[in-house]
């Protein structure tokens, strides 16, 4: 006789089974809320750290930097340098494929470095690679790179996030459109890029490191408003958020489901002054503006204490950084200097910001108020990524509208040259690089060039000090603060953190 089975039992069993399956195979999808939009997914053509950080989803370099900014091997196994400092021979890992099935080998490295070092391609990061004379594929796992002249920081250039290995087949297929079609050796591949809303990446099944990645997808979502970014974390709409609004840090820290992190930074915040334009061509005006800003108050008002007043033009944690006596807040002295410079009643100018998130807005408002106290009327504009690319990065000195410009810089190579040359060398005015002060001093240029020709630490220290002494004295900047990096994440997200250069490390990220 057949046993009777009640329908209600079958239904209950089905529900339990479905729930168990759901738990066992729940997708590990992470949403990361970031402070601004992305300009491109081509690391060689991006000037902003965020775009390059997101590009690490798809791309890897020959070398990289760990969270202490120390050099590590990635797609390379080792390297040697010739005695004259001209030739770098790099041994590559074997058996790695790009996401389109193309082999990663010496020919692929050559294709990327040939593209990067060709000025005809007009890539924004060209200056990193302009010293490459030629790249040769000696055999499938050996690359020889010959420089035009000794460049002691070159291996750090190869570790820069811009030096990504892109599939040569994809480069040939997409050409100048490669920024919309990333194909690398990284742990994730592109799923969707909605240019006004998000970039979503998905697990690359053929990734060469066993057991990785652990996440199924990451959605990078730009959220300009600080409060909205923090709210997304609290409601579970996002699992990681950076930057965290400083004024909300204490509140988030009390949330039992969220972990708040304040980590070291090499992010220097500053205001450059266009020294080729009146009144900023007058050293007394630049000195006056440095006296006009109350940096300790700025730390409290805009950064809620998560920053320190700048004591130089290079963050202290970068090798060869020099520290100086901080600029005191002295509005009386500022007004005296303005009078001596021929501006007893002050002047009107513009103050632009490279970002439009809430913290940048606070810095602009604070600075505007401080300048007003010494008679300077500043019209402020907070730019989005597209405006910055068009109006600041894309225009040369003659057509540039930049006067005062609030921005930040992190030396993503982890060494002093990249903290100084892109921002102060004469050849690095926009659109070449990011010398938005349009500063030029032959002695500084010479000292920076000489420092790259020696591997002697004592000589490098002397040369970098001499350059920084001149820059500090001539004041093309108003150095403001060095940030602390405040991020937060759901406690069930592990292995995801902020690098000192404000990039991200997420290769080992997992959702528990």
Swiss-Prot record:
Give the family, as the similarity comment puts it: Belongs to the bacterial solute-binding protein 5 family.
**Matching InterPro entries:** Peptide/Ni-bd (IPR030678), SBP_5 (IPR039424), SBP_5_CS (IPR023765), SBP_5_dom (IPR000914)
Q: Name one GO molecular function term.
A: peptide transmembrane transporter activity
Provide the organism lineage as a comma list.
Bacteria, Pseudomonadati, Pseudomonadota, Gammaproteobacteria, Enterobacterales
- Gene it is expressed from: gsiB
Q: Where in the cell is it found?
A: Periplasm
User: Its function?
Assistant: Part of the ABC transporter complex GsiABCD involved in glutathione import. Binds glutathione.
The processes (GO biological process) annotated in the record are: dipeptide transport
For this protein, the record's Pfam families field holds:
SBP_bac_5
Q: Which GO terms describe its cellular component?
A: ATP-binding cassette (ABC) transporter complex; outer membrane-bounded periplasmic space
Oligomer status and interactors: The complex is composed of two ATP-binding proteins (GsiA), two transmembrane proteins (GsiC and GsiD) and a solute-binding protein (GsiB).
Instruction: Name the keywords, alphabetized.
Output: Periplasm, Signal, Transport
Q: What is this protein called?
A: Glutathione-binding protein GsiB
Q: Which domain of life is it from?
A: Bacteria
Signal sequence interval, chain numbering: 1-26
């Amino acid at each position: 006789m057949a046993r009777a089975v009640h329908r209600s039992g079958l239904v209950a069993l089905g529900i339990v089974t479905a729930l168990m399956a759901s738990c066992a195979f729940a997708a590990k999808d992470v949403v990361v809320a970031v402070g601004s939009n992305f300009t491109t997914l081509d690391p060689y053509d991006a000037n902003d750290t965020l775009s390059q950080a997101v590009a690490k989803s798809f791309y890897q370099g020959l070398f990289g930097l760990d969270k202490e900014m120390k050099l590590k091997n990635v797609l390379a196994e080792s390297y040697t340098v010739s005695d004259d400092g001209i030739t770098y021979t790099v041994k590559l890992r074997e058996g790695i494929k790009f996401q389109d099935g193309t082999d990663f080998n010496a020919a692929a490295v050559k294709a990327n470095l040939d593209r990067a070092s060709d000025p005809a391609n007009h890539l924004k990061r060209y200056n990193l690679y302009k010293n490459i004379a030629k790249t040769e594929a000696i055999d499938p796992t050996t690359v020889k790179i010959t420089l035009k002249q000794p460049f002691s920081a070159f291996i750090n250039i190869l570790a820069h996030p811009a030096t990504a290995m892109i599939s040569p087949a994809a480069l040939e297929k997409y050409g100048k459109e490669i920024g919309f079609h990333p194909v690398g050796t990284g742990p994730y591949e592109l799923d969707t890029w909605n240019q006004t809303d998000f970039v979503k990446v998905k697990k690359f099944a053929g990734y060469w490191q066993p057991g990785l990645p652990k996440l199924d997808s990451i959605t990078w979502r730009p959220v300009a408003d600080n409060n909205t970014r923090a709210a997304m974390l609290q409601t579970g709409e996002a699992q990681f958020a950076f930057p965290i609004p400083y004024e909300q840090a204490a509140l988030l820290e009390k949330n039992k489901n969220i972990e708040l992190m304040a980590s070291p930074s090499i992010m220097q915040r500053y205001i450059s002054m266009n020294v080729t334009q009146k009144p900023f061509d007058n050293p007394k005006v630049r000195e006056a503006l440095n006296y006009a800003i109350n940096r300790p108050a700025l730390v409290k008002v805009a950064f809620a204490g998560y920053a320190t007043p700048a004591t130089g033009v290079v963050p202290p944690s970068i090798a060869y950084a020099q520290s100086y006596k901080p600029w005191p807040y002295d509005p009386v002295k500022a007004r005296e200097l303005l009078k001596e410079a021929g501006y007893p009643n002050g002047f009107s100018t513009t103050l632009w910001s490279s970002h439009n998130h809430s913290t940048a807005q606070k810095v602009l408002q604070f600075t505007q108020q401080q300048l007003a106290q010494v008679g300077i009327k500043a019209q402020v504009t907070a730019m989005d990524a597209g405006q910055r690319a068009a109006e600041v990065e894309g225009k040369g000195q003659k057509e540039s509208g930049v006067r005062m410009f609030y921005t930040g810089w992190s030396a993503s190579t982890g060494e002093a040259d990249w903290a100084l040359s892109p921002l102060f060398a004469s050849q690095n005015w926009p659109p070449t690089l990011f010398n938005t002060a349009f500063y030029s001093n032959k002695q500084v240029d010479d000292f920076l060039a000489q420092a790259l020709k020696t591997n002697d630490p004592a000589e490098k220290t002397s040369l970098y000090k001499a350059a920084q002494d001149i820059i500090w004295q001539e004041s093309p900047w108003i150095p403001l603060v060095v940030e602390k990096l405040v991020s937060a994440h759901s406690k069930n997200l592990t292995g995801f953190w902020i690098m000192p250069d404000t990039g991200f490390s997420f290769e080992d990220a997992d959702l528990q």
